[in-house]
């Protein structure tokens, strides 16, 4: 961590406070009151955050990582699985009180419940699963499982995610059997949301751990999605190997010492995918999670990068440098000016950056050219300064009133 700090890099730690591991956890044997048996979880009885000693245990653990090891922040795993929501507010208050300014501590959530109130109560940001799911559908066409909630009107869905953060802000979810999900989030800053195209869950939980380099409909569409992700005001997150277009799968792997537990996990994976015909219908050749070979096969550097890897590195490098110089210095105080869909697969969005500059996005994630509506005048595009285009013809075609297929355009207008 000290070495990273010397290089100007921050380091965050992913902490799991919603459960202990299923293997090697002996705490129930000598501290049974630590758990509550009225709430079962896939990992056993739930942790009892009603107990003051339990709450203090995890507060001290967070402080330990931040003070003894000097991590710059924590990413809290799956906090929707913690039934005592008030403890999360208590944790943020405790950490902020123990580590006051000027030291900056980042507290980031993974929360399937989309609780905006936590981002109003001491947490900095949340991983934006909604935006990922919309973009994944647009890139791959997949519409089963939880992607079913995002397959209808993907252009509208992406527009809402870019303008307001989450798609689900209290409306019912079909995938969750009609139960409401989420809280209103339009009042939050764009930097309250972490935007990603891939992560360890979204790849590793797939049957074969396949990446977007294998799944995306076209290479051009994936390049456009990367340009959207890295230049949007939301915080970009990249998964290892994305930057060089890795095609090595990231498989689901474990290291359980208990043979019975390893067998149960192996069988559970097969049953999980039995109802997904596109994933093999329970194919018995699913990689064994507890095999060391499965772990070894997930090394993102396993396959030689070649020329294609170099092209991806150059693509990411160009976009990250552009973000560093043109976007990041202006993010404080940025607010959305709204977004709208362009056809089924396109979107137009605008943000007023902190220094008054206007950032504009035109994206077409579809296979056909998308005519611009009369309300978006090509002459205004022509007058604006182009920040980036994902294809050589994208900007010129937009000036003529059409968005090229699988393309994206960013405009940046300075305002004094």
Language model features by range: what are they?
Residues 210, 214-223, 228-238, 242-416:
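Carbohydrate-interacting/catalytic domains
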Residues 39-49, 199-213, 292-304:
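Short glycine/proline-rich turn/loop motifs
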Residues 3-7, 61-64, 68, 91-94, ...:
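Generic, well-ordered alpha-helical scaffold segments in large soluble proteins
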Residues 27, 56, 205-206, 361, ...:
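Extended hydrophobic-aromatic, low-complexity segments
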Residues 8-11, 53, 57-60, 83-90, ...:
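Generic recognition of stable, solvent-exposed alpha-helical segments in well-folded globular domains
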